[in-house]
Amino acid sequence: IRAEKARLVKEKKIKKDKNESIIYRGDDNSYYEKFLATGEVKCIDEEIPFEIPKGWEWCRLKHMCSMQAGKNISASEIYDKKSVLHPYRCVGGNGLRGFTNTFNAEGHFAIIGRQGALCGCLNIESGKFYATEHAVVVNGFGIIPSLFIYYFFTALNLNQYATATAQPGLAVSNIVEVFIPLPPLPEQLRIVSKIEKLLPLVKTYEQAQ
């Protein structure tokens, strides 16, 4: 994951984290965080909320993924229907807004609404698309599956990190510092597979109520 972050920084796709750190468990069984810029090491036992299974690791959210807001686009550049001239999906805080002639993201990402009533809204987007300023594109480092990130954020309850103002906004700078338990890749895939199998059953049950 650290190698992937270094590559993205070098390619200027993400900004260098001035407070980059690593979290590890010492010989005394306590958790420590080492800040790479200064070499400072501090015990973080009081910040660790619970024990995790063997093979899992505690990290901050910023160690797992980057979170980048999209770019502003004029309403006149967004069209209701897809066409040869406007083939790319334009994605806002609550999913599809329309279609446009350019894209600023390519891949498979979790998308988070970052302002107003749509603050904390989650979607998945694939391929080439345009993310507006109301959407945060979440890009997992390394080989972390985007669906694992999507379901993780769903469980995280993002609304708790919204600013308490007349126009709520997602405080990304706070979210990236949250401690998270990160399982090994095979376990990430098993978690996603299990959720995907259970969701249709949950929906069927909800419809029957």
Place the predicted regions along the sequence by residue.
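Accessory (non-catalytic) regions of SAM-dependent nucleic-acid methyltransferases
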Residues: 1-57, 63, 207-209
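Short coil/turn segments at secondary-structure boundaries
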Residues: 14-24, 74-82, 163-166
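Non-catalytic DNA-recognition/assembly elements of restriction-modification systems
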Residues: 42-75, 80-93, 185-193, 198-209
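Hydrophobic residues in beta-strands and at strand termini
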Residues: 52, 140, 180-182
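A short beta-sheet element
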Residues: 92-154, 163-176
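S-adenosyl-L-methionine
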Residues: 149-158, 162-166, 172-209
